[in-house]
Regions:
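Alpha-helical transmembrane segments and their helix-start/interface "positive-inside/aromatic belt" motifs
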Residues: 27-39, 91-95, 134-138
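Active-site-proximal cofactor/substrate-binding loop regions of enzyme domains
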Residues: 98
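Alpha-helical transmembrane segments
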Residues: 102-116
Length: 312
């Protein structure tokens, strides 16, 4: 009898332990499903959360970035693919060619002055021609021009390529003496941009005559189809650090692609004499991450458009 009781107790204990293990396994399995469901829900909500978290706050300009600097003697740093290509051509093609020509001409002048003056050469040479020299000074300029022309044509072709599919359209209108930025792909709203008073520009950390009350806000890393026109006289939309310049002519739409590699504030000015206050038409282009741009569009009463993934 005691042996039977012990066996019965062991059986009950084993069954209860198995039941408890099964309950724990079921609990873990249920918890795993809950965690997986929660993770999936968070993953699905991530874009919406990111969009909700993205808010537009005017970016502070960085000293020396996208604007002129005191004592500057060369091009501004470039923040567009076209600008970087042009800067490479200037640094690695034009400057070496110019330096070589200047040094060659200088050396030849020194040699001629030293060897063929009246004291060193009292009897002048009566040589009428030199075939080798004539061939050299004919072929050398041709080769030099080819070395300059080929990359120049490629650079010009890249500057005027048509806008790719999905590019954001921004229409720039030049007025006397301010700018208007219209966003047709985002509902067609227009932003009017005037120069800040010098004291207000300094307070915001911007250079006088460059700061604007409203900037042209665009997404960084996304191709921009920039269209320009003039409402009254001819203006010119120019931003040196983006290697961008396009005339704004009344009654005509000019178009060019703009691509900005990095977020930041980039300054320019009207580059076509347009009247008494021509010198007071600053341009401030602010490139921001795509979610921030979409938040800015909503703050202007516009609708975000479907854009390609930024290349930044």
């Amino acid at each position: 009898m005691p042996i039977a009781l012990v066996r019965h107790a062991g059986t009950l204990f084993g069954a209860n332990r198995f039941r408890a293990t099964g309950l724990r396994a079921a609990g873990l399995k249920t918890g795993g499903h809950l965690l997986a469901s929660l993770a999936g829900a968070i993953g699905a909500m991530a874009p919406a959360l990111a969009q909700a978290a993205a808010t537009y706050v005017p970016m502070k300009p960085m000293p020396g970035k996208g604007q002129p600097v005191p004592g500057g003697y060369t091009f501004q740093d470039q923040y567009s693919p076209i600008g970087q290509e042009a800067l490479r051509m200037h640094d690695y093609v034009l400057l070496p060619v110019i330096t070589a020509i200047v040094l060659l001409v200088l050396i030849l002048l020194i040699v001629v002055m030293a060897r063929f003056n009246r004291r060193a050469n009292p009897v002048p040479s009566r040589t009428s021609h030199n075939t080798v020299i004539e061939v050299v000074w004919t072929l050398a300029p041709v080769l030099i021009l080819l070395a300059i022309v080929v990359p120049s044509i490629r650079l010009l072709a890249h500057q005027y390529q048509p806008a790719p599919k999905g590019a954001l359209t921004v229409k720039v209108t030049g007025y006397q003496w301010y700018w208007g930025y219209t966003y047709p792909d985002n509902g067609g709203f227009e932003v009017i941009s005037n120069m800040l008073e010098p004291a207000e520009a300094v307070r915001r950390g911007e250079q006088p005559q460059l700061g604007a009350d409203n900037r042209m806000v665009v997404p960084a890393g996304v191709p921009i189809r920039l269209q320009t026109t003039g409402a009254d006289v001819i203006h010119s939309f120019a931003v040196p650090s983006l290697w961008f310049k396009l005339d704004a002519v009344p009654g005509r739409i000019n178009e060019k692609v703009l691509m900005i590699n990095k977020p930041g504030v980039y300054y320019g000015q009207c580059s076509e004499l347009c009247g008494a206050r021509h010198g007071y038409m600053p341009i401030a282009v602010e490139a921001v991450p795509l979610p921030v741009f979409e938040a800015w569009v909503k703050s202007q009463g516009g609708t975000p458009a479907s854009l390609p993934t930024p290349a930044v």
